[in-house]
Amino acid sequence: MASEKQIVLVTPVWNDSIRLGRFGPELAQALASSGLSVRWIVSDDGSSALEKAALGTLVDRLRGVYPQIELQLNQERVRKGGAIYRAWDMCTEADILAFVDADGAIDAASVLRLLSHACAQDPMSGVIGVRHNTVATPVQRPWQRAVSFRVFTILVRRLIGVDFEDTQCGIKVVPAAAYHVMAANLMERGFVFDVELLLALQQQGCQITELRIPWREIPEGKVRPLLDAWGMIAGLLRIRQRAKAGQY
């Protein structure tokens, strides 16, 4: 039975057509056979002209499998959070808003699982993926990434008070009504936008379910743990200041 809830799924992309080219067909096929009402938006984050052209060709090809896909091009770089929020902002008819990374680290089956879970929940509930290494949900990543992940999680809990197992996993599903109420107060667009989003959702009274999913490191990722660490910490401090000021 098809879901009655209208879902918007955004895949942010920045100079990443090759990895989306590997993951996109899998996700398109999964969405086509899901029975869910999903508007899939590939949101480009100011990629090069060649990348934009490659994305256009790719989306045209994927449309043959899943017609409800579209490409949104941003002329300037707006960062990952900006690419997601710009797409969400134009979808006022949606009941559920979601995003999934373009690299394929999260498989299509997990995407459908989270979307289906959200459809069955209370309208003011959300769902996020969690990377937790078990037999059922194997996680494959270098030890350096595992260490930086644990350190960042501790910082988030101590600085922000957001007590989730994994704030940075590349799939989140949120209630559209709650997002549109708080959207103007969301300032972060870089790698810590997820933390601010989750904090604001909690402040809105939303219940967030954490679902463990399989995950594997895909080469050519955009996050550089050592180089990006200071910027991410600065972002957490900005979020903390806004939270103390009652912005959320």
Role assignments for model-derived ranges:
Residues 44-55, 104:
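A conserved acidic beta->alpha catalytic loop
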Residues 5-11, 27, 38-43, 233:
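Hydrophobic targeting segments
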Residues 36-46, 72-74:
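Short beta-strand/loop segment that forms part of the nucleotide-sugar
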Residues 16-31:
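Short, well-formed alpha-helical segments that are part of the catalytic scaffolds
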Residues 75-91, 96, 108-187, 218-223:
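Acceptor/aglycone-binding surface of glycosyltransferases and processive sugar-polymer synthases
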Residues 1-7, 185-248:
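Hydrophobic helical membrane-anchoring modules
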Residues 16-19, 47, 80, 104:
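Donor nucleotide-sugar binding loop of glycosyltransferases
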